[in-house]
Amino acid sequence: MRNAALPSIAVGFFDGVHLGHRAILEGAEAALTFVDHPLTVLAPEKAPTILTTFEERVRLIDRPVIALPFTQCLAEMSAAEFADRYLKGYKVRCGENWRFGKSGEGNAEWLKRYGWEVEVVPYVMHEGAAISSTRIREALKAGKIEDAEAMLGRKVTVSGVEVSGKGEGRKLGFPTINLKLGVYAAQVNGERAVVNYGYAPTFGERGWTEPTMEVHLLKYLRKERQFDSPEALKKQIAADCERARS
């Protein structure tokens, strides 16, 4: 199956499309991924909160994508059937821990044994450890925006439905990314901003949805808290804005 003319395909779930994923994607002419995380079928109780929606992943992969719905049928497929059906005619680029087929029986060595040309891309490191989607999730849960940004290789971007309250301000409902609750310095439509991610405890859950918007998070400012009055909240917002500008 070795043939210099074969196109290369990068394989993986690519959640977040971080620097490690980009190393795998580099030089590949196409990418093979799953629409949903495999654990949503294999072990739903262990399925992680995803960093990027499917649409965002495809945009960030930035090359032709073969997207497979991860179904129970696919989970039961042998490595031989999966490789024959989806990898035939390609040179494969993958990460060190990539596996495929029922119970993960297939990997890079399996493919090489059966004649595939495979390039295993080493882990990309950050502060002495391999970059992974799990590490980025943990950084975001801890409010460590700078660490997440360093591993992603870009600004932390979240997309969500804008919810407008009764003149009290605006908040965002994010369907995917799991962030530490609190107030963030951010950038919206090119302008510096302060964004509250949480439950708006001072005013309660009032509001209506408006079009989806995109926010670039810059740094974590403080925990979310309830204020005794709208005036106290406004004073704190002014202080938050001053910190966001610094």
Locations of regions flagged by a protein language model:
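Conserved beta-strand termini and adjacent loop/short-helix elements that scaffold enzyme active sites
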Residues: 1, 32-34, 67-70, 121-123, ...
